Amino acid sequence: MESKTYYATTTKRFILRTKHQDWLVETQIFYNEILAFYYNLYLKMSDFHEEGGQRVMRELEKLTIVGRDKQEVLYPLPWCKVPLYFRRAAINAAIAAGKSYLSRDEQQQRTQTFTKSVTFYKGMYRNLNEKSVELKVWSGEMWTWLHCRISGNVFSKGEEQLSPSVVLKEKQAELHVPVKSVVSDGRKAKLRIQDQEKIAAVQFINRDRLAVIAILDAKGNQCAVHFLKGGTVYERQCQKILTAIEKSEKATGYEESHHSNKKYWMKLKHLNEYYSHKFSKDIVEYCNEQQAGILVLPLYSKTYTKYVMNAVGNWSVLHLSGQIREKLKYKAWKSGIIVLETEAAGISSKCAVCGQKIQKNGTEYICKEGHRGSRYLNSAVNLGRKCLKSFEKQAV
């Protein structure tokens, strides 16, 4: 029996240049008009709401597109000669938007207008490489092929390119290309535990030492430890920008400075992106060095997470840890490491050596038996062992 092949999908961003930027704008406007049409139709048809995406698409097309039998349809599409795959991309986006609206606890007013980026399905783009791409676009009068130059990234060997999207930003256009690559190891966690693989348990410290990674063997013994540094550098750079924003607001007033400070807010966003990518990459690389096949993260309640995140603000090291977690999930998977989340309850209150209750003193701890050390490392070890025990219970 052949083993199953597993894949990871990530998105690569390119800067896109063309002589006809206005055609890209026209194409996006047209795309969103079609999207809005199908969004409202989908919400109107309550019978479709529990169906899968492909089934819903077929039903929506039956209601809007005249078939080979030339029979009239109930809701004819109010535009002529819309390319098949352009229409289907808009329908898929409309279904996703409709399902999102219906899933909200409190359904507010429906979206009236959309500004979604255009996804170009097969047949709507061609000759995609690292330097250029041809896109089928709407000029405002006709459909035409538009040659575009792209730069700023590369495709790796073995990657399969999927349907790209054109993202229009204030100062530039970007081409976002999803790429699919084979994952070296896609085994489930249970099999990895059975194969006695090491696990890496992460506890976020949210100081200069941003996180601690404890490597445990299959029996829960600590094999190695690594402290990830850099939190102070990140906070210092963020604070420098926030100070500049504060000075600008005092000098010109909030309303006037809000627009002029946009470049500063973008710098903060880019800092967050850069460091969350960097630190998540560092964690994955350390796991690979230690041959750990499972990465364990602490899981907190949504209420607790929301409360804490609101209290610390968007540019703290603690808030950065949330971005690191999200990036770890796909970076680790791409590297053949599986990510698990284990309930954090109880991991910080007992000694990992003897199980006695601990007393905290800053970043350190001490227990009744005299064991002492980093309370964050102690929590990481407890987290890893708690994860291992959960698999023992499953095996019983």
Locate each region found by the language model.
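Broad gene-expression machinery/nucleic-acid interaction feature
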Residues: 11, 130-134, 145, 172-174, ...
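Generic hydrophobic, helix-prone segments enriched in Leu/Val/Ile
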Residues: 8, 34-38, 60-61, 124-126, ...
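Positively charged, helix-rich recognition surfaces that bind polyanionic ligands
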Residues: 176-396
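Acidic carboxylate diad motif detector
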Residues: 57-172, 180-182, 226
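Intrinsically disordered or highly flexible coil/loop and linker segments, enriched in small
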Residues: 40, 44, 103-104, 289-293, ...
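Gly/serine-rich nucleotide phosphate-binding loop at the start of the catalytic core
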Residues: 1-92
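Stable alpha-helical structural segments in soluble proteins, enriched in small hydrophobic residues
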Residues: 30, 34, 89-101, 377-387
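Short alpha-helical "patches" and their helix-cap loops
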Residues: 48-55, 107-116, 299, 396
